Amino acid sequence: MDPDLRGTARAGNINDLYAIIQSKPDILDKELFVETPLHVAASPGETNFALEILRLKPSFRRKRLSPLHLALQNKHSDTVRRLVKFDSKLIRVKGREGLTPLHFVAKTDDQLSFADQKVDLLSKFLDVCSSSINDVTIHEETALHIAVKSSSFYTLQFLLIWLQKTYKGEVLCLTDEGGKATLCCILRCPFHNLRHASIYSLVP
């Protein structure tokens, strides 16, 4: 990547971005990017710059990890929310091993300092793209499978309540690559305060 463009993306300076575009009008089209300015800006949480690049060059959103993955990885929740508001399809972009942003949040630790943000992000993702609950990784795992494997009680509890409210219990019947249904994984998990009877009632 052009070093001036990289530096501008890291700093999140939109004025400098347009100065570079003015001096090199085809810079966003000409370069073969491995790491795009969008990703460079999203990683440190330079939200406005990331959104401006996304507007100028929409194709960047599909390169490697999405900017949403990078913002999540670095816990820039405000950047995540604004990127989702700009383009809800980012929620279904798959990164390494087929992990979507929903899977990524389901996988993160249940740190008390981050628990409320996790629930807020899960709610936001599912509000704007409810079909993302059906997305699976290359291992055929749903967000629920991942929550169980990661011992993420807050995620699992939220998703089960969401399934109950939205009548999408069929996701509990989806199996991973080992043939284990989401429902079976949940019933065998160590979260003793989950009520098995209420979980069974979700299955259509």
Give the ranges of each region predicted by the language model.
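Internal amphipathic alpha-helical repeat/solenoid segments
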Residues: 13-63
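N-terminal "cap/leader" segments of large eukaryotic alpha-helical scaffolds
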Residues: 1-19
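Ankyrin-repeat intra-repeat helix-capping/turn positions
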Residues: 12, 45, 75, 109, ...
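Solenoidal tandem-repeat scaffolds enriched in leucines and small polar residues
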Residues: 78-79, 83-157, 161-163
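Membrane-proximal ectodomain caps of single-pass cell-surface receptors
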Residues: 131-134, 138-144, 149-204
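Ankyrin repeat domain, specifically the short helix-to-loop turn at the C-terminus of the second helix
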Residues: 21-26, 51-60, 81-90, 123-132, ...
